[in-house]
Swiss-Prot record:
The keyword Lipid metabolism applies. It catalyses: a (3R)-hydroxyacyl-[ACP] = a (2E)-enoyl-[ACP] + H2O. It comes from Nitrosospira multiformis (strain ATCC 25196 / NCIMB 11849 / C 71). GO terms for cellular component: cytoplasm; membrane. HAMAP family: FabZ (MF_00406). InterPro entries: FabA_FabZ (IPR013114), FabZ (IPR010084), HotDog_dom_sf (IPR029069). This is 3-hydroxyacyl-[acyl-carrier-protein] dehydratase FabZ. Its EC number is 4.2.1.59. The keyword Amino-acid biosynthesis does not apply. Signal peptide: none annotated.
Length: 146
């Protein structure tokens, strides 16, 4: 899945779109995506000017976006103005190594279960085959409140 198809499913746009390409997709089971981390990312200006590191919360957000793609593409639900994909929980988040400019962040999301419209995933971010972060994420799609 290239960036054009990703934009059909995710409502995120620059500077908060954190998935560049989907490398593998198994409907209802798993998705592997890629984020190319460059020095041009706006967060590196302040985090940290003399030693740029991608904020851990943004690594988790990238994982949540990969999980969203897994759910939305599995359900064949494209982004629209009537619904929103909510990040509703995170458990067991761990950060194992910093993510720096020049890294290719591999984002892996695997469905653990789905119940009453709430999806739970095992999520892992890797750089060069080494774990950068991992967590269990919970997300849901709901109608947008007016």
């Amino acid at each position: 899945m290239d960036i054009h198809e990703i934009l059909k499913y995710l409502p995120h746009r620059y500077p908060l779109l954190l998935v560049d390409r989907v490398l593998a997709f198994e409907p209802g089971k798993s998705l592997t995506a890629l984020k190319n981390v460059t020095i041009n990312e706006p967060f590196f200006t302040g985090h940290f000017p003399h030693h740029p590191v991608m904020p851990g919360v943004l690594v988790i957000e990238a994982l949540a976006q990969a999980a969203a793609l897994l759910t939305l593409k599995t359900s064949n639900v494209e982004a629209d103005e009537n619904s929103i994909y909510y990040f509703v929980g995170i458990d067991n988040a761990r950060f194992k190594r910093p993510v720096e400019p020049g890294d290719q962040l591999i984002l892996k999301a695997t469905v653990l279960k789905e119940r009453i419209g709430i999806w739970k995933y095992a999520a892992r971010a890797e750089v060069d085959g080494r774990v950068a972060a991992e967590a269990e994420l919970m997300c849901t799609v709901r109608p947008k409140e007016t």
